[in-house]
């Protein structure tokens, strides 16, 4: 998936536009951008986009992309984006009252490995609940 395809997501387009203007999209915005973009773009391109915004340089951008890819973080859910809005000045989701917005899983066609990872996590969560254990850590 190319950059143009990422722009089909209004949420990702908002982040891309803000980065292009050199804005600070906040730590959660950078994490959201990296966790999505790293699934669709070469790592070097994700780093270059993160460097455009204020709030971090090349070292921080490379470290974030490495962390996201090595740990296999999945893109955040809509609810998580709404939680992120409360934690920082830059609003990742500018329309929190509209339930049809800011859902990355509806806005983009996620790679199969993302869907498989989520399904595996939910199975582990169900099994843990069945056995009366705590849910697996993410």
Identify what each model region corresponds to.
Residues 1-138:
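Basic, alpha-helical nucleic-acid-binding regions used in initiation and control of genome expression
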């Amino acid at each position: 998936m190319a950059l143009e395809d990422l722009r089909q997501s209004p949420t990702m387009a908002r982040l891309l536009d803000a980065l292009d203007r050199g804005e600070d999209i906040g730590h959660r915005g950078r994490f959201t951008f990296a966790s999505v973009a790293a699934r669709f773009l070469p790592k070097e391109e994700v780093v270059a986009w993160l460097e455009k915004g204020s709030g971090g340089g090349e070292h921080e951008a490379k470290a974030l992309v490495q962390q996201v890819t090595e740990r296999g973080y999945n893109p955040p859910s809509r609810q998580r984006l709404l939680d992120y809005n409360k934690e920082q000045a830059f609003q990742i989701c500018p329309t929190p009252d509209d339930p049809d917005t800011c859902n990355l899983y509806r806005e983009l066609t996620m790679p199969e490995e993302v869907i498989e990872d989520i399904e595996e996590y939910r199975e582990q969560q169900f099994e843990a609940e069945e056995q009366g254990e705590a849910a697996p850590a993410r």
